[in-house]
Amino acid sequence: MMPTTLFAGTHITMTTVYHITVSQIQLSLLKVTAFQHQNSKKTTKLVVILRIGTQVLKTMSLYMAISPKFTTSLSLHKLLQTLVLKMLHSSSLTSLLKTHRMCKYTQSTALQELLIQQWIQFMMSRRRLLACLCKHKKVSTNLCTHSFRKKQVR
C-alpha cells in the first residue's frame, strides 16, 4: 500500500467512526433531555452529560491527530455548543469548572472561546441577581460586595 492510500483508508475509517459516534451522542442527548423532564436531580443529569461530552472530545482529539480539518466541522461545533449550553443551564459554578476540564481534551479554540463567552454571561447574570436581591434586602450587603471571593480569615 502506498502512504497516500493508507492515509485515505484511515481517513475514511475515522470519518465513519466519527459519524457513528456523533449519531450515538445525539441520541444520548435526546435521552438526557427526556431524563431531565422525569427527574430534577441536577447532579445525575450533569454526570450523564459530562460522560457524553467526554466521549465527544476524546473522539475529536483522536480524529484531530489524523485530520486537522476536523476542528472546522460545523456539526461538531454545534454538538459541543449544545453540550456546553446544557451544562451551563444548571447555572452552577461546578458545571463550568467541569466544562473547563473538558476543554483540556482538545486544542479547539472554538470551544475555548465559547466557554469564555458563557463564563462572562454566567458571572454577569449572577452579579445582577445578587444586586437585585441586595436592593430588596433579601441577602446581606456583605454577600453582594464579596459575592465571588472567599472570606478572608482574620
Swiss-Prot record:
Effect of residue 115 to Q: In strain: Isolate GD01
Region (Mitochondrial targeting signal) location: 80-138
Pfam families per UniProt: SARS_3b
Compartments where located: Host nucleus, Host nucleolus; Host mitochondrion
Main location: host cell
GO biological process: regulation of cytokine production; symbiont-mediated perturbation of host apoptosis; symbiont-mediated perturbation of host cell cycle G0/G1 transition checkpoint; symbiont-mediated perturbation of host cell cycle progression
Sorted UniProt keywords: Apoptosis, G0/G1 host cell cycle checkpoint dysregulation by virus, Host mitochondrion, Host nucleus, Host-virus interaction, Modulation of host cell apoptosis by virus, Modulation of host cell cycle by virus
Superkingdom assignment: Viruses
Motif range (Bipartite nuclear localization signal): 135-153
Assembly and binders: Interacts with host RUNX1 isoform b.
Gene Ontology CC entries for this record: host cell mitochondrion; host cell nucleolus
Protein name: ORF3b protein
Record annotation: effect of changing residue 31 to Q: In strain: Isolate GD01
Role this protein plays: Induces host cell G0/G1 arrest and apoptosis.
